[in-house]
């Protein structure tokens, strides 16, 4: 069984508005059978942090196009995207690159 993880989850570029305007969240992910990955983190975020309009953040089992995801300041595309296995003390940043005009 995977141990609980302490992870910093941060939202920027307007994405924080979907989370009551709170940019940084220090969260403890509970222990579970499978290791935590970005895919399971997104499910947890949707259930526990997302306050409104989930369609602006989640599309299918991933983030919507236009949301940049950084894990420890590295582009998640270099780390395996949804399959990246989270480590204790990781920092995951979601930045919306879509803005109204």
From Swiss-Prot:
Alphabetized UniProt keyword annotations: Cytoplasm, Isopeptide bond, tRNA processing, Ubl conjugation pathway
Any one Gene Ontology molecular-function term assigned to this protein's record: protein tag activity
Transmembrane portions of the chain: none
Record localization: Cytoplasm
Pfam families from the UniProt entry: Urm1
Family matches, as CDD domains: Ubl_Urm1
Keyword flag Cytoplasm: yes
UniProt modified residues of type 1-thioglycine: 101
GO annotations of cellular component type: cytosol; nucleus
Cross-link Glycyl lysine isopeptide (Gly-Lys) (interchain with K-? in acceptor proteins): where in chain: 101
Pathway: tRNA modification; 5-methoxycarbonylmethyl-2-thiouridine-tRNA biosynthesis
InterPro entries: Beta-grasp_dom_sf, Mopterin_synth/thiamin_S_b, Urm1
Protein's job: Acts as a sulfur carrier required for 2-thiolation of mcm(5)S(2)U at tRNA wobble positions of cytosolic tRNA(Lys), tRNA(Glu) and tRNA(Gln). Serves as sulfur donor in tRNA 2-thiolation reaction by being thiocarboxylated (-COSH) at its C-terminus by MOCS3. The sulfur is then transferred to tRNA to form 2-thiolation of mcm(5)S(2)U. Also acts as a ubiquitin-like protein (UBL) that is covalently conjugated via an isopeptide bond to lysine residues of target proteins such as MOCS3, ATPBD3, CTU2, USP15 and CAS.
Annotated family: Belongs to the URM1 family.
Subunit structure: Component of a complex at least composed of URM1, CTU2/NCS2 and CTU1/ATPBD3.
Protein name, as recorded: Ubiquitin-related modifier 1
Native organism: Bos taurus (Bovine)
Primary gene name: URM1
């Amino acid at each position: 069984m995977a141990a609980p993880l302490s992870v910093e989850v941060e939202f920027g570029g307007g994405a924080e508005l979907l989370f009551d305007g709170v940019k940084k969240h220090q969260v403890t992910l509970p222990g579970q059978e499978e290791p935590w990955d970005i895919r399971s983190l997104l499910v947890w975020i949707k259930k526990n942090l997302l306050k409104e309009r989930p369609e602006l953040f989640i599309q299918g089992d991933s983030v919507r196009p236009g949301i940049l995801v950084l894990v420890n300041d590295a582009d998640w595309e270099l780390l395996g995207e949804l399959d990246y296995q989270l480590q204790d003390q990781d920092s995951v940043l979601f930045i919306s690159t879509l803005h109204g005009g």
